[in-house]
Structure formats: structure tokens, C-alpha cells
A protein has these predicted regions:
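N-terminal loops that bind phosphate or other acidic moieties
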Residues: 1-185
Length: 187
């Protein structure tokens, strides 16, 4: 059981997540129908997170604050397309929330995701439901609601991924472009 996450583990989590995104970028590209079906969402998000990871790897410290700042800077500087900019804002909100912490509990992770969601929504002039914004908002709401019940960070993250998948499944009901295309979306 992992009750809290230190900087070293946080770094490993982001690197693993970036690898997972890279390995699935083609699938995500196929989900892309909004705002235009140009099929580049996975590629743009992958390039954005790769820039964040490149910056992360320049940090010698395992300080959560330093890691968060590096991820935020790298993702913003390397943001590609709408989805990349939104991802960079999610990371920015997460980084701001974890600043000053030595360890991250389940509740800290939930609050960080909520901060990421809120930051991303504020960055978009006209947020549209049925997009990546919806998935991160619904996931963060679930995280905050359930964070007091969970103690194991791994179990909590697994529940969170499951909830994000459910949210993604609901996106066609929220966005006309998706209903017309009969698909799921991430942007």
C-alpha cells in the first residue's frame, strides 16, 4: 500500500503517463472530432507532455515543488494545438496545488486534479462540454468526492482512471459533433 507519493515517485508517474500517452496517440488521434476532426489531438498532447518530461529531466532535485514547476514550464513552452494548451493548463493547476508539499496524499492528489481542471476551464474562453475539459472535470469531482474514503494512492489512481473512462464514454451524449460521428472524444 502506498499512502503518499514523494517527488521521486511523482516523477516516475509523469514519465510513465507520458509513455502511455505516446503509445496511444494514434488511438487518441482517431477520437478527435472537435473543434475540427483533424486527427491530431493525440499527437499534440504527446508532443506537449514530451516537452514537459524533457524539462522535468533537467531537474536534479526530487522536490515536488521543483518538479511541478518544471512540468508546468515544459508543457506550456511545448504546448501544441488546443489539446496541448488545455493539457498544459491542467498541469499548471496541478503544479500550483502541490507547491510546497513534501509528500502527496490521496486528498492532495484529488485537490491537485481539481485545481488542474479549474485552471483549464478558466483558460478556455468558451468551454464546451463533451471534450477533454468534461473528462478532467468529472474525474476531478469524483476524486474529491472519494478521496476521503481511499488511503492507497495506487488503488485511488486505478479508480480515477476507471471513472475517467466512464466520463469519456459519456462524451457523445454531450457534444453534437460526437453524436453525428457516433464516437468518443478527448477534445
Amino acid at each position: 500500500m502506498i499512502e503518499s507519493i514523494n517527488g521521486k515517485l511523482l516523477k516516475e508517474m509523469f514519465i510513465s503517463g507520458a509513455n502511455h500517452l505516446q503509445n496511444n496517440k494514434d488511438l487518441i488521434d482517431k477520437l478527435n472530432v472537435f473543434p475540427v476532426p483533424d486527427g491530431d489531438t493525440g499527437t499534440n498532447m504527446s508532443l506537449t507532455i514530451a516537452s514537459a518530461i524533457k524539462e522535468l529531466k533537467t531537474i536534479k532535485s526530487d522536490s515536488i515543488t521543483d518538479l511541478g514547476k518544471a512540468l508546468s514550464k515544459g508543457s506550456l513552452m511545448g504546448a501544441r494545438g488546443n489539446s496541448g494548451v488545455i493539457l498544459s493548463q491542467i498541469i499548471r493547476g496541478i503544479a500550483k496545488s502541490i507547491e510546497g508539499k513534501d509528500q502527496l496524499s490521496v486528498e492532495d492528489l484529488a485537490k491537485a486534479l481539481k485545481s488542474g481542471s479549474d485552471t483549464a476551464y478558466k483558460a478556455v474562453i468558451k468551454p464546451i462540454e463533451g471534450t477533454i475539459l468534461t473528462v478532467v472535470r468529472e474525474s476531478s469531482d469524483f476524486a474529491v468526492k472519494n478521496s476521503k474514503k481511499a488511503k492507497d494512492c495506487v488503488e485511488f489512481m486505478e479508480m480515477l482512471v476507471e471513472e475517467a473512462d466512464k466520463s469519456l464514454e459519456r462524451t457523445p451524449d454531450l457534444l453534437k459533433n460526437l453524436k453525428d460521428a457516433d464516437r468518443k472524444s478527448v477534445v
